Amino acid sequence: MTTESIIDIHAHVFPDEIAQKATDSIAEFYSMPTRHSGTAGLLISQYDEAGISHGCIHSVALTPHYIRSINRFISETVKKYSGRLTGYAAIHPGAEDIPGLIDEVKKMGLKGFKIHPDMQKFALDDPDAMDMFGRIEGKMPIIIHTGDRRFAYSNPKRMKKVLDAFPHLTCVCAHLGGWSEWEDAWRTLASYENVYVDTSSSLYALTPEKGREMIRHYSRERVLFGTDYPMWTPMEELKRFRELHLTDDEEERILYRNAKEFLQLT
């Protein structure tokens, strides 16, 4: 497989004027340093360095107030770097007129949604969140930050309630199904055929042997490569992934083919 055939499913970008402030907030939230300021221009240069051909970008609306400005920015960024990026829209359970928002982001060329319950401070199985999932189900996919032992908002057990209620909700449970809760995640989520997982912000905390084991608990058709830029550089995450020593077929699927099909890239 050539290095030109790599897709990153999980990258965050911010407007240049607030990028450093935004990434500093992320670093504070996780008590971990970020690698870069989180601008789209720097992401593209990092992709070029790592040999990554395409990325899926998104940002999180901490309150409903920020949804539309974020989505405009993501849409404009995708257009600016035509062919290199797919955009996922921000959404929040407190948003008004979610059906209207779905229509709006489709017209903007955005292909799905992204949520981060721990930062947005809602539980996955809250009534408003369940209503949101019901309105999204069958219409657009969603990337969900799952897992964090410090909180109870997005743990695998709550995610299971969502999946049981909405069997046609196509979702990516980020960070191998549950950041810092990897064992609970695969035991709880791996059997759901509508669930994908990504590798972002997981491999740094797992030995190559454990990372390989975690990935193989899921169907190889439903694992996607993610960098979580700007938490890590694309080169760092790609190096960690290569150190897993997966089979050629597993690498090709996870680094490229699965995401190509998931994002419906031509």
Task: Locate each region found by the language model.
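Conserved, mostly hydrophobic/aromatic
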Residues: 10, 47, 74, 105, ...
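Short beta-strand segments
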Residues: 8, 56-59, 90, 172-174, ...
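Catalytic pocket-lining loop regions of alpha/beta-barrel enzymes
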Residues: 111-112, 121-224
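Active-site gating/metal-coordination segments in enzymes
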Residues: 53-54, 62-143, 148-150, 191-193, ...
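A general structural detector for well-ordered alpha-helical segments in enzyme core domains, enriched
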Residues: 42-46, 70-77, 100-105, 128-132, ...
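Histidine-centered divalent metal-coordination motifs
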Residues: 10-16, 116, 145, 175
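Mid-to-C-terminal alpha-helical segments outside catalytic/metal-binding sites
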Residues: 2-12, 18-54, 103, 219-224, ...
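Short active-site segment of divalent metal-dependent hydrolases/proteases
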Residues: 13-14, 148, 178, 231
